[in-house]
Amino acid sequence: MAELLDRTDKMLLEELKKNARENIAALSKKLGIPRTTVHYRIKRLLEEGIIEKFTIKPNYKKLNLGTTAFVLIRYDPDSGLTQKEVAEQIAKIPGVYEVHIVAGEWDILLKVRAANAEEVGKIVIEKLREIKGVGQTVTMVSFVTIKEEI
């Protein structure tokens, strides 16, 4: 099977990850390829669903959401809901930025953002634990984020 992305596509994606607003002329210069090629490749990557959307990376500290926490959840199979249904309910909670169904000792992993640890606690205690199907939880507050990609 042929590789889906060639070297040029990968370099183009890396540049767009750094700055999705970079114009075609600048990308052409950085990558050493014609502007028409850059335009065509971006169009193809969009059409093939490799690029889903162009987005931003907010500064969460400036948005008063400087505390990141990860929450592990044990699914309660006696709840009458499927694990996916529980995860979909959790995804609706303000402050929950990611919801993953995972393998292992725990069933669901969340990424939560809030102003401080107290606000994270409110999300977990007042919102998350009220959802039918959420069993035991463990919350880990991040001290420092070393790497985070969009």
From Swiss-Prot:
GO terms for molecular function: sequence-specific DNA binding. Residues 24-43 bind DNA. It holds the Pfam family AsnC_trans_reg. It comes from the Archaea. One of its GO terms (biological process) is response to amino acid. Disulfide bonds: none annotated. One of its GO terms (cellular component) is cytosol. Residues 5-66 form the HTH asnC-type domain. SUPFAM superfamilies: Dimeric alpha+beta barrel (SSF54909), Winged helix' DNA-binding domain (SSF46785). The keyword Transcription regulation applies. Keywords: DNA-binding, Transcription, Transcription regulation. The keyword Cell inner membrane does not apply. PANTHER family: LEUCINE-RESPONSIVE REGULATORY PROTEIN, TRANSCRIPTIONAL REGULATOR AZLB. This is Uncharacterized HTH-type transcriptional regulator PF0250. It comes from Pyrococcus furiosus (strain ATCC 43587 / DSM 3638 / JCM 8422 / Vc1). The lineage of its organism: Archaea, Methanobacteriati, Methanobacteriota, Thermococci, Thermococcales.
